């Protein structure tokens, strides 16, 4: 029997075994079998303690908040970027969270990092360790939605980590005079004691202000304070602290190690005698609170305070902290951790990594009174730490001179809220080690003496003004734990920030200078900020290439004024006509698109509008243009005008607009709705002859540049652009909106529907959905008319997309829908993003970056994937028994290798440009050499897909699209769900297009000849 061409071959049928099919009946399986089957596919841990993972020597990242680029982009897209954002109000350092998340969503990671570091010099540290659930996340408006709040800490960590990989140093504010030309007051000697978060923050802001004689004295051999010594490596790696210290040192701040308060004669008095006019105390609370029952116990006996234990763990696990590698504390058996704060849970999870078999966290009050943030407690719970509430330590049980247990008394809360210890209720716990984490204090007599002459409070710490951070001596300031206001790293950072302003104010007062009553601290700066993104077109110099299109964002002149104040380089007026052509709009008229699926809120991929031109008169716009040019002489204003096909009208309106002092004109020949019925807009712009004549009329009537705004709703936009060129236009705008019908409801009525009859018309689609059309138009015009100026519009919503249009041949960029999605402040993101994209082109070490995106490392859930396949000899998926095998192999390796990590490393910290930094003009039309006719494409250089099994999450999307939309070239293992590419792969790239993990699938050169499957022999011999 002859083979049927319309039936799959047997080998293809086997490939299709797991391909989805429409369900025709209900299936039946026993409960027992399903309980067993689920274990094979389980990704989350089993609830039983039998599944406990050995964590000894494993200091890999455990934070749930850590994000890959994919995760960061998805999370940033969810953010509403709210007005008067509550998250910002809940941040101690007042981070502009809305702005930095906006930058992340636009792939401008430097812009995000700049926003973060401008308000928080320890932005990466805080992104990793901030108790966000109690701060910014606690105020997120998305708490009122089903999907919950934004992972702000993870986004903050992601952006600053990417910037750290760029290796770009911090610089002084470029607007400051050189150090030699700064006033004498800025050479004041300033000392900071303690190199922890508060001092690093304070010194950074003082250096940004221009002070150049700043020294930090640190008693330890290492920097970073508690960030280094007490926060574990798996929460805060040492290289993060080093990165932030290096940024501070970039500004000239000096750090002196092994010289602390009360050490080697260092006192407040001695510093003053040495010529320091201001001292900032940021030494924390260096001694542990120690309950009386532990008096005399030592680490050799099995007793540690958190101040003993955590630094030992840090020195052994944080490579670079010390010159030599020390050993972890050797724990075993049962460990009791006393306390209910973040430090207690750090001790508990660290104990597991030091060999403890089981850890009990014991605290005096109940779960509802735990001081630790939920993130910390949850991490300990997931690692199978046990919690014992309502217990107060009463007596240490010893055996052979060592700790062998602890006797507790039950605590109870009375009706009046007070707590009592009931000694009749006794609990005995066996323990091999006890770690006390009952807080900290200052009780070193040498330090207390060195603090003289400032007054101390009843706790033995300085009296500090909560607003100025001054002590009782006006030249001495304090912050962080020792000041008594901060309980977290970010609050200590803010103490330093707050003090820096008042130190500045104090120093200037000594020199008779008055400064602003409102604090105004400098922003973070690096060389990226100095990149020139101005561009000249038609003899007009644009401060930057980003401007507002003639659209709803320029409804009024006052809106344009506000846009210029925010930094927009140019703006077009809303299109206006002669008074005889005045219009009145209908409503509703601007609606969200359906091109992004069911996404509600900002981030819409498109809008549809049936809005007409401006309802305001030509006189209004001409007077407004004159006002704006007078107040913003460096900004460019283009008057957008429209008439019917009438030479007298075009002549009159063009002359009127020119006399208003507009820098240029835009001829709107493309409005796709409403105006065409009046013989205007689209009615003029679809005929090359009409376009050519209108341009000739305007050229004859005016002397300033003008640009014809083209419609994409034509067969060949190049013909229209050529007509404009032949008519004397100085350039064109490409493109206006695409004519469309956005949505029909279930009852067949349209949206928008006007009036009782719910009538509509075809409107203009704008936004990202039309970007491919606009890019095609811009590149086609640029190829046909080399050097002809193009103002691009159509889906420009970021610096990255803007650069695409510049590469395609545009000179400047018009924006509308992106502002409708957000607000005028996006201009800061666009400018910084473009500066970064240009700057990074000059750094050879980053040649493998895609814009601001670093190469994707192998990861799962944003965390680097150790090369376990090298340990077990094969790649396995991350679920069920395979995950267990991988976890056990890694645990054994970690234990045997003393915690050395097998994973990719980051880039060097400092990268210096070795090539000239391109300007905007240098990148215009760079992509055109890659665009041409299909016949120019080489069909001998074939590629095929390659799946990275270590990054694959086993969803099978590649498999399904290849089966039902492609070439049945992917096998899908029924047990491991790992896809395998066969030689049948044609390199179509559908699999990569639907893969949810960035770079899990890559297209690589084909190693075997490609032979198309023709179905039947070509010209068979009969």
From Swiss-Prot:
[4Fe-4S] cluster 1 binds at residues 79, 82, 87, 140. Its EC number is 1.3.1.2. Its cofactor is FAD; FMN; [4Fe-4S] cluster. Binds 2 FAD. InterPro entries: 4Fe4S_Fe-S-bd, 4Fe4S_Fe_S_CS, Aldolase_TIM, Dihydroorotate_DH_cat, DPD_II, FAD/NAD-bd_sf, FAD/NAD-binding_dom, Helical_ferredxn. Homodimer. This is Dihydropyrimidine dehydrogenase [NADP(+)]. It comes from Danio rerio. The lineage of its organism: Eukaryota, Metazoa, Chordata, Craniata, Vertebrata. The gene is dpyd.
């Amino acid at each position: 029997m002859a083979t049927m061409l319309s039936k799959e071959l047997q080998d293809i049928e086997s490939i299709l075994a797991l391909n989805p099919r429409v369900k025709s009946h209900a299936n039946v399986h026993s409960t027992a079998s399903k309980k067993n089957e689920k274990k094979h596919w389980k990704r989350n841990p089993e609830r039983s303690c039998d599944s406990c993972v050995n964590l000894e020597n494993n200091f890999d990242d455990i934070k749930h908040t850590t994000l890959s680029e994919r995760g960061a982009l998805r999370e940033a897209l969810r953010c509403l970027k709210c007005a008067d954002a509550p998250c910002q109000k809940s941040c101690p350092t007042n981070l502009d969270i809305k702005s930095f998340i906006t930058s992340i969503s636009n792939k401008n990671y430097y812009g995000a990092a700049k926003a973060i570091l401008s308000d928080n010099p320890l932005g990466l540290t805080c992104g990793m360790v901030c108790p966000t659930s109690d701060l910014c996340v606690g105020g997120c408006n998305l708490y009122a939605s089903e999907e919950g709040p934004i992972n702000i800490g993870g986004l903050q960590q992601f952006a600053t980590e990417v910037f750290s990989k760029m290796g770009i140093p911090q610089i002084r504010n470029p607007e400051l005079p050189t150090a030699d030309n700064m006033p004498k007051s800025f050479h004041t000697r300033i000392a900071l004691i303690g190199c922890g978060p508060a001092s690093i923050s304070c010194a950074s802001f003082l250096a940004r202000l221009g002070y150049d004689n700043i020294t930090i004295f640190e008693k330890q051999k290492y920097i970073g304070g508690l960030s280094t010594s007490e926060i574990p490596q798996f929460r805060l790696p040492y290289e993060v602290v080093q990165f932030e210290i290096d940024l501070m040192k970039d500004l000239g701040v000096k750090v002196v190690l092994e010289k602390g308060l009360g050490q080697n004669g260092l006192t407040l008095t001695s510093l003053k005698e040495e010529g320091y006019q201001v001292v900032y105390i940021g030494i924390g609370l260096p001694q542990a609170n120690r309950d009386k029952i532990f008096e005399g116990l030592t680490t050799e006996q099995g007793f540690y305070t958190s101040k003993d234990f955590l630094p030992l763990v840090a020195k052994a696990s944080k490579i670079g902290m010390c010159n030599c590698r020390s050993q972890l504390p050797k724990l075993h058996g049962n460990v009791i951790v006393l306390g209910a704060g973040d430090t207690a849970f750090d001790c508990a999870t660290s104990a597991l990594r030091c060999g403890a078999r089981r850890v009990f966290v014991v605290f005096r009050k109940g779960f509802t009174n735990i001081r630790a943030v939920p993130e910390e407690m949850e991490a300990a719970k997931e690692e199978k730490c046990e919690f014992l509430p309502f217990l107060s330590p009463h007596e240490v049980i010893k055996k052979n001179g060592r700790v062998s247990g602890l006797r507790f008394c039950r605590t109870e809360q009375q009706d009046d809220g007070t707590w009592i210890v009931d000694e009749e209720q006794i609990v005995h716990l066996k323990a091999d080690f006890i770690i006390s984490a009952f807080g900290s204090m200052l009780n070193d007599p040498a330090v207390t003496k060195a603090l003289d002459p400032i007054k101390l409070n009843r706790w033995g710490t300085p009296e500090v003004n909560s607003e100025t951070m001054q002590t009782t001596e006006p030249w001495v300031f304090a912050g962080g734990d020792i000041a008594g206001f901060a309980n977290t790293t970010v609050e200590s950072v803010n103490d330093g920030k707050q003090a820096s302003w008042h130190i500045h104010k104090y120093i200037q007062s000594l020199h008779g200078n008055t400064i602003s009553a409102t604090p105004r601290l400098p922003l973070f700066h690096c060389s990226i900020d100095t990149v020139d993104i101005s561009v000249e077109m038609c003899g007009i110099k644009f401060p930057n290439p980003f401007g507002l299109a003639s659209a709803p964002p320029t409804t009024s002149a006052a809106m344009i004024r506000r846009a210029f104040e925010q930094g927009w380089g140019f703006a077009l007026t809303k299109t206006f006509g002669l008074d005889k052509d005045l219009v009145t709009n209908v409503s509703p008229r601007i609606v969200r698109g359906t091109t992004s699926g069911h996404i509600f809120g900002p981030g819409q991929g498109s809008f549809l509008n049936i809005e007409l031109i401006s309802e305001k008169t030509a006189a209004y716009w001409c007077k407004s243009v004159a006002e704006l040019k007078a107040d913003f002489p460096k900004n460019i204003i283009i008057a957008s005008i429209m008439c019917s096909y009438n030479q007298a009208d075009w002549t009159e309106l063009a002359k009127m607009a020119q006399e208003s002092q507009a820098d240029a004109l835009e001829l709107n020949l493309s409005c796709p709705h409403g105006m065409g019925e009046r013989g205007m807009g689209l009615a003029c712009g679809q005929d090359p002859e009409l376009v050519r004549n209108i341009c000739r009329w305007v050229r004859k009537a005016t002397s300033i540049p003008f640009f014809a705004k083209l419609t994409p709703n034509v067969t060949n936009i190049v013909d229209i652009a050529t007509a404009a060129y032949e008519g004397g236009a100085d350039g064109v705008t490409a493109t206006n909106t695409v004519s469309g019908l956005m949505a029909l409801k279930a009852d067949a009525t349209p949206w928008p529907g006007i009036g009782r009859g719910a009538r509509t018309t075809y409107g203009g689609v704008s936004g990202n959905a039309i970007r491919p059309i606009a890019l095609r138009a811009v590149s086609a015009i640029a190829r046909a008319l080399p050097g002809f100026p193009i103002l691009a519009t159509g889906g420009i919503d970021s610096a990255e997309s803007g650069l695409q249009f510049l590469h395609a041949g545009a000179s400047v960029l018009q924006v509308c829908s992106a502002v409708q999605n957000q607000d005028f402040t996006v201009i800061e993101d666009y400018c910084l993003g473009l500066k970064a994209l240009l700057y990074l082109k000059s750094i050879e070490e980053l040649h493998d970056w895609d814009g601001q995106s670093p190469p994707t490392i192998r990861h799962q859930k944003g965390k680097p994937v150790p090369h376990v396949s090298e340990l077990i000899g094969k790649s396995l998926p991350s679920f069920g028994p395979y995950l267990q095998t991988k976890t056990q192999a890694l645990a054994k390796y970690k234990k045997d290798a003393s915690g050395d990590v097998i994973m990719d490393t980051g880039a060097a910290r400092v990268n210096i440009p070795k090539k000239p930094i391109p300007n905007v003009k240098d990148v215009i039309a760079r992509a055109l050499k890659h665009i041409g006719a299909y016949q120019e494409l080489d069909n001998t250089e074939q590629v095929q897909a390659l799946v990275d099994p270590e990054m694959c999450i086993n969803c099978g999307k590649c498999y399904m699209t290849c089966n039902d939309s492609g070439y049945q070239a992917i096998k899908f293992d029924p047990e491991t769900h790992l896809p395998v590419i066969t030689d049948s792969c044609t390199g179509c790239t559908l699999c990569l297009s639907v893969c949810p993990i960035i770079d899990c699938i890559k297209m690589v050169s084909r190693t075997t000849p490609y032979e198309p499957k023709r179905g039947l022999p070509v010209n068979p011999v009969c």
